[in-house]
Structure formats: C-alpha cells, structure tokens
Amino acid sequence: MTKSAHTTPPPDAAARRSAPPVLTYSVEQLPPFDAGFYNRARAELSKVASLTVPARDARAFEVAAGHFFRIVSVEGPQVGDLNLWNSHDLAERFYSGKTRALHATHLSTGDRLWSSFPKLRPMATITHDTLDWYGWDEDGAGVHDVIGTRCDPYTRLLLKGMEYHHCCHSNLTRALAAERNLPLEEAEVHIHDVMNVFMCTGNTRDTHQYFMKASPVRPGDFIEFFAEIDLLVALSACPGGNCGASHSDDTAKCYPLKVEIHRPRESALSGWQSPAPNKYSRSHGTR
C-alpha cells in the first residue's frame, strides 16, 4: 500500500526529514545478560518432559522457574506461535510490544521476553538459538519476530469471507481452555500477541508493510529459553507451515514441533532468584 501525498511539501520539508533518529529506549540500565551463568546452568541438563505439538494445532504446558525449555524442529520447516503466562496469574502475560521496544523486532540469544503491566519483568530469557547465524538478510528480514500478532479467524473472515478454525489464535485458545479447564470464551481473552518462533519476516522497504518468507529452520534446529518465573506456555504449529506462501488455510505443508523441558543441576542455580515485579508505585500522579 503506497501512501500518496495530498499536500504540498513545505519549504523546509527536507530539513524536517533530516532529523537524526534516536533510540526510543536507553537500555543500559537493564540487567545485563549473564552468559556465564546461563551457560553453566545449561551445561548439565536432565530432560524431565517432552511433548509434540501436532501440525495446525497447539498444546499448553507448565515450565517451573529455573528450568529450560526448547522448541525443536523435528520433521520439516515449521513456524510456531508462542504465548507465555505467569502460571499462577494469567493476567501477567507476555508483552510483545514492550519486548520489541526494549530489544528489537526479532529476538535471539540474550534477549528476554517481558511481561505485561504492572509486573513488567523478564518471564523468560533466550539462552540458545541455532538460527542466530541468520541475522538480517538482503530483504531486511530476520528470524523469531515480535512484529506479527498471530493468524486469527477474525482477520481471515474479514479478508477472505470464510471461516477457518485452525489459525494460531484458535489453536492457542483451544490449548489454554483444555489445559486450564476453561470455557472457550474465557480462555480466548487471555490469548495475546505472540513471539513468532522460527518465522522469517520484515517490513518492505518501499511501503513498510509486514512480509514473511520461507523460514530457514530445518530439522534439528531449536531455540532454548530459561524460565525466569513459573510459566504456563502455549505453542501453536502455524497452519502456514514455513510461512513462505500462505497462512490461515490448509494449503501449506505443515509439520509438528517438539518441546523439551530440561532441569539444570540445583547447584548451578545457586544465588539465582526470579525477577521481582516492577516496583512502580502505581499512584499515577494521584499522591
């Protein structure tokens, strides 16, 4: 979609456009990524659980604080849509927009997944990513984005005029409802903007529209997270498969995703504790 100018540029248009960019957040005060700690913790892991997320479906699972979980490509290139909640309080959930603002449009090793207001704290830290080599390609695309929201049946109906029930939004809704024994309508309000695991995306240079391209993920690739708090996690194996052509339909070749949960040696976590909730007073200028 091209933006057409309807007004005559002012005489100082070039000067206005030449203002230098400034990073929105100065993040030097964020706790640094302690690679040594996480590497020691992941050096000796015991697998305590695993599960398979079927193609075009989703599953929810618990991960205790101090454990690692991996999302693994097992049969073919497949994108996954990830939701996170505080296991004890579904109101605290992954905040993709703030994560994007604090880190970048695409995440990798050392980045954290931040929770919603008012807690605003790290929920999980990415500790290993076999696709970190990808970086930014010639189209400006990267992997593991926090730009896209998730494919959903409402937008599908709006744009295509047809219902489809295996979009990631619906998959995640069913998974949360089943895991927590909730009515679908109650579960749905907790589904939120995702981290698009393994998805390769960017914004077009001319119109700045969101685009996707075939994921570079291959069987054996994985992304690994450290649970900073007790987590409830839901993962959908996107109906778009590798998201190289379409989504929100049954045309793409899709594959399952594997999840592994690992426990480190207890001594490896010596001195570690879950991040405290944000300490803002919540007075909002009233006292």
Task: Report the location of each language-model feature.
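Acidic, Ser/Thr/Pro
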Residues: T2-R287
